[in-house]
Amino acid sequence: ENNLGYSVMGAENVDPTAPKDMKESFNYNNLRMPDELWPHGWVPDFQYKAEESIRIADTLTYNILNKFDTILDCGTTLVDAHQQMYNTTRIIHYPAYEGSLENRQMRIGEHSDYGTITLLWQINDVPGLEVQDLGGVWHPVPFEEDGVVVNIGDLLQRWTNDYFVSTKHRVVNTHIHMPRYSMPHFVDPTPGTIVKNLTNEPDKYEPIESKEYLMWRLAQSYYCLLYTSDAADE
C-alpha cells in the first residue's frame, strides 16, 4: 500500500493491456521508511547511501522546479507545492533472460510517470530505454555516464494544461540476455496539494488532489492493490 520496499519480479504491470513487467525493484522515499523494509542484513550501509542519494536528488529537483516556475512565469508555485514533497527512489533490476516471451511482453511496458517530474539515472550501459515523441515515434535514449534523464510526469502535464506533455517511455527487449540497472527518482508534490491549471488557457483537466491521483495510478499498475478512498488518505 505504501509503495515501499522490495517488489518481486512480475508484481507490477505499468501497461495494463500487456503482460507483466520483467523486473524487480526496491523503493525507498525521503520520509522515514519503516526499519523492517531496509535490507540491513544484506547491505549494512545501504540505508545511509540511499538517504544520501535522496538528498542529492531533492537538491537537483528544486533547481529544476525553479526553472519550470521561471518558464511558466508563475512565481514560485511549483517550488512551493513541493516544500514537503513525497519523493520515491526506485532501484530497478532487469534480469538477463533467455526464455520465451509472451506477446507484447517487455522489460517494462509503455507508460508515463505519475508525478511532477522523474530524474532517471541509467546505471549500466545496456540499451533498451526508449521515449516517444509527439508524433508517436519511439527513440532510443543513449547512455550518458553520470548523466540524468528528466521526464515530464502526468501532474506537470495537468498543471501546465498540456504545455508540457508527460513523456511516454518503455524498456524494450534489446540485449535482454544482459542484466540492466536503472534508478528513477519520482517527484511528487506535498500530499494534499491541489493540481490545477496554471496557464491562462481554458482548463483541459479538472483539479485533483495529488496523492489521490498517485494512488489511483498505482492501483492500476500493481495487480495486488485495490484502490479505495481510504488508501488515498493514508
What is the predicted function of each stretch?
Residues 1-37, 44-83, 141-144, 175-185, ...:
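Fe(II)/2-oxoglutarate oxygenase catalytic core
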Residues 25-34, 56-129, 172:
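Conserved double-stranded beta-helix
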Residues 105, 121-211:
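Catalytic core of Fe(II)/2-oxoglutarate
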